[in-house]
């Protein structure tokens, strides 16, 4: 613990907490200050000046990062018949119906993404209390309730991320690993930023992006100048 604290102090000394860095500077600092012994994830965080209590200011969606996330996604699909076969052919890790519902209700959660065809939502809805709090419930807005299960599986395997503003207007997203080349992290960051910018509600008032930052797992939070994106 003392060693980790020493590493954190050393990392903090390299970052000016009063400064908003350019995206290139921020990414370089994330890589430089990372002290995790594993290939840490890199995440961005946005504090948006929105009121999610208003229906027209709720922000939620999905996108495919140009350079992927570096994370292997275990994809579960609720489908039957031909659609189940399509999901398997596309690379889904788990495909089923009521059998999967029973397994999940029994405590099994070894998957990262859940996709369902519309006709399966009647049985998937039984898992609301399990999947909902974990942000795993299939939703049309994130492309996880769809008849095109093959495309959904391929996108999830290929770097698709989902995002959602919480009650305080905060949005977090994984954009890669510290092992990524800096230019690939920058490209992923800019792609996500573009999505956030376009998601601005027409009724939002004041400065839309109150704060933007980037960090690695166990790392230091680094402020980013939105204008550099």
From Swiss-Prot:
Molecular function, one GO term: tRNA binding
Complexes and interactors: Part of the 50S ribosomal subunit.
Function: Binds directly to 23S rRNA. The L1 stalk is quite mobile in the ribosome, and is involved in E site tRNA release.
One Pfam match: Ribosomal_L1
Family matches, as InterPro entries: Ribosom_uL1_bac-type (IPR005878), Ribosomal_uL1 (IPR002143), Ribosomal_uL1-like (IPR023674), Ribosomal_uL1/biogenesis (IPR028364), Ribosomal_uL1_3-a/b-sand (IPR016095), Ribosomal_uL1_CS (IPR023673)
Protein's gene: rplA
An example Gene Ontology CC term for this record: large ribosomal subunit
Domain of life the protein comes from: Bacteria
Keywords: Repressor, Ribonucleoprotein, Ribosomal protein, RNA-binding, rRNA-binding, Translation regulation, tRNA-binding
GO biological process: regulation of translation; translation
Family (UniProt): Belongs to the universal ribosomal protein uL1 family.
UniProt name for this protein: Large ribosomal subunit protein uL1
């Amino acid at each position: 613990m003392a060693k980790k604290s020493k590493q954190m102090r050393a990392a903090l000394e390299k970052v000016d907490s009063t400064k908003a860095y350019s995206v290139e500077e921020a990414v370089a600092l994330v890589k430089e200050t990372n002290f995790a012994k594993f290939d840490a994830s890199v995440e961005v965080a946005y504090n948006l000046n929105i009121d999610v209590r208003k229906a027209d200011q709720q922000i939620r969606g999905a996108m495919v990062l140009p350079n992927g996330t570096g994370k292997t996604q275990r994809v579960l699909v609720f489908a039957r018949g031909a659609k189940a076969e399509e999901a398997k052919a596309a690379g889904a890790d788990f495909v089923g119906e009521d059998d999967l519902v029973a397994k999940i209700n029994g405590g099994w959660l070894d998957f990262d993404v859940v996709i369902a065809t519309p006709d399966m939502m009647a049985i998937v809805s039984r898992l609301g209390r399990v999947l909902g709090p974990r942000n795993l419930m299939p939703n049309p807005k994130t492309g996880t309730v769809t008849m095109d299960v093959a495309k959904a599986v391929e996108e999830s395997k290929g770097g698709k991320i989902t995002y959602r503003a919480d009650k305080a207007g905060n949005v977090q997203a994984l954009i890669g690993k510290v092992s990524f080349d800096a230019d690939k992290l920058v490209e992923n960051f800019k792609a996500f930023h573009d999505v956030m910018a376009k998601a601005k509600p027409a009724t939002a008032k004041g400065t839309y992006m109150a704060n933007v930052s980037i960090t690695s797992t166990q790392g230091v939070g680094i402020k980013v100048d939105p204008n550099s994106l």
